[in-house]
Amino acid sequence: MSQLVLILGDQLSPSIAALDGVDKKQDTIVLCEVMAEASYVGHHKKKIAFIFSAMRHFAEELRGEGYRVRYTRIDDADNAGSFTGEVKRAIDDLTPSRICVTEPGEWRVRSEMDGFAGAFGIQVDIRSDRRFLSSHGEFRNWAAGRKSLTMEYFYREMRRKTGLLMNGEQPVGGRWNFDAENRQPARPDLLRPKHPVFAPDKITKEVIDTVERLFPDNFGKLENFGFAVTRTDAERALSAFIDDFLCNFGATQDAMLQDDPNLNHSLLSFYINCGLLDALDVCKAAERAYHEGGAPLNAVEGFIRQIIGWREYMRGIYWLAGPDYVDSNFFENDRSLPVFYWTGKTHMNCMAKVITETIENAYAHHIQRLMITGNFALLAGIDPKAVHRWYLEVYADAYEWVELPNVIGMSQFADGGFLGTKPYAASGNYINRMSDYCDTCRYDPKERLGDNACPFNALYWDFLARNREKLKSNHRLAQPYATWARMSEDVRHDLRAKAAAFLRKLD
C-alpha cells in the first residue's frame, strides 16, 4: 500500500524524517502552497516569494532523485487553500494507506495535523524533527525542577551533546562563553565586502510575479530579490560566510552601521530555518574554520552559541510554554504599534534605518531587532502581541517557534522572566555607543530634556519609573534604579512629562 508524505515549506531537507523509508515507486511526496499559510498574517512579500521559490526548487530536487512529487501552486485553480484541504484532495486522488509527516514547528499547524486521522480515517504518522538537537521531551526533562531556565546552562548541555568546541568534557579555550569579547562598537572600518546575492532564475521570477499579483498590499518590496532558493546556492552562502565574514563576526556582532546593515552577520538563518541548510552542519563548518586557523575562538563560539544555544533554547521554550504564551503581558502594555513601524517614516534615525531596511530586505540582524525596534516597543509600552505579530510578518526567517519566544520573552519581557533575567531596555547612550545612527539624527543622544533630546532617553527612565513595583527586586536593575533615586524630584518629573508628551503623539 502507498503512503502520502506531506512536506511543509520549512522542511525542505532531503534528510527530513518524513522521507525515511519512502518507496519511490509507489509513495507520493506532497508539497503545497496554500493561502491559509500565506495569509494568516500579512507576511513580507519577499518572505512569501522566498519560501514558495525554495519549495518549487526543492520539488525539482526531489524529482531529480526519483521521487514522485505532487505539487500544488498557490494560484492553481483547484487549490483547496489549506493543508487539510490539499491532503484531502490527494487522498481522494491517490487513496494512500497512511499519511506521513514530520512534526510542524508551530502550535497552529500541529493542531491541524492532529485532526488528520479523525478527518480522513487513515493512519497518520507524525515524526519527530531530528534537525533539532533537543526533542520536546528532552527539553522538558532539562527544564524540570529548575528554578530558572538559564540559556547558558542549556547551551553547555548542547556543547557536550554535540562535542562542538570540546576537549573531552572541557570547553576548548577553557571557557564556555566568550561574549565579553564580542561587544565592539561601530567604527567606519567595519565596512565589509558585500554578501553574495543570487539572481532570480525562471522559477523565482514566476513566483515574484505571482506574489505581486496575489499579495499587492502586503508589507515590503520584491525588488532586488537575492535570496538563495536552492541547496547549492545556500551552501555557497555558507562558504562565503566562513571564508569572508566569520573571522570578524564575534567582536562586531553587536555593532550597527548605516552604510552596511549586514556587517559580518551570516545571513544564513533563512536557509537553516527552512531546511536548505542543516544547523549542525553549519556549526561544524564554523568549528573547522577555527581548527584550521581561519577564525578566532571568540567568533566561532559566539556563532555556534547563536545556533545550538539560542535557537535550540527558543524552540524548547516555545513548546514548553504552550499556546497561551502569546498572551503573556507582564507589564500590561496596551499601546498600538505606531504607524512608522510599517513605513519607516520617523525622525528617529535608528528606527527609520532599521525599518526601511526591513521593508527592502525582509531582514535585520539580531541587535537591530532587539535593541532598536524591540527596545523602542518595550519602552513605549506597545502591546506585546502586536509586536510579536509585526516581527512574524516582516522577517523572512521568522517562524513562530523561534520568533515568539524571542519577542515575548527576550525583547518585550512580557513573560515576566520565564525566559530572560532582565528587560533589554536601553537609552540613547547605548545606541550611540554601538552604532553610527546618531551621527545624522535630528535628536541628540546626550540630551535628556531639551528640544533635541533623544526620545529613547526619557522613555527609558519613564519605563523604569512606571514599572518600578514589578522590577525593583531584579538585582540586575539595581544600578539604574539607584541612578534614578539620585535624580532630583524636578528632573524625574520632567523626564516623565517629556516621555508622556512624546507618547501622546504616538496615540
Curated annotation (Swiss-Prot):
Cited SUPFAM superfamilies: Cryptochrome/photolyase FAD-binding domain
Keywords attached to this entry: 4Fe-4S, Chromophore, DNA damage, DNA repair, DNA-binding, FAD, Flavoprotein, Iron, Iron-sulfur, Lyase, Metal-binding, Nucleotide-binding
Binding annotation for 6,7-dimethyl-8-(1-D-ribityl)lumazine: G9, D10, C32, E33, V34, M35, A36, E37, A38, S39, Y40, G105
Record EC number: 4.1.99.13
Knockout consequences: Cells lacking this gene show a strongly attenuated photoreactivation after treatment with UV-B irradiation.
InterPro entries xrefs: Crypto/Photolyase_FAD-like_sf (IPR036134), PhrB-like (IPR007357), Rossmann-like_a/b/a_fold (IPR014729), UV-DNA_repair_photolyase (IPR052551)
Binding positions for [4Fe-4S] cluster per the UniProt entry: C350, C438, C441, C454
Record-linked Gene3D superfamilies: 1.25.40.80, Deoxyribodipyrimidine photolyase-related, DNA Cyclobutane Dipyrimidine Photolyase, subunit A, domain 3, HUPs
A Gene Ontology molecular function term of the record: 4 iron, 4 sulfur cluster binding
Pfam families: DPRP (PF04244)
The keyword Iron appears for this protein: yes
PANTHER family: SLR1343 PROTEIN
Annotated function: Photolyase involved in the repair of UV-induced (6-4) lesions in DNA. Catalyzes the photoreactivation of (6-4) pyrimidine-pyrimidone photoproducts by using blue-light energy. Can repair (6-4) photoproducts in ssDNA as well as in dsDNA.
Family label: Belongs to the iron-sulfur bacterial cryptochrome/photolyase (FeS-BCP) family.
Record-given protein name: (6-4) photolyase
Organism: Agrobacterium fabrum (strain C58 / ATCC 33970) (Agrobacterium tumefaciens (strain C58))
Organism taxonomic ancestry: Bacteria, Pseudomonadati, Pseudomonadota, Alphaproteobacteria, Hyphomicrobiales
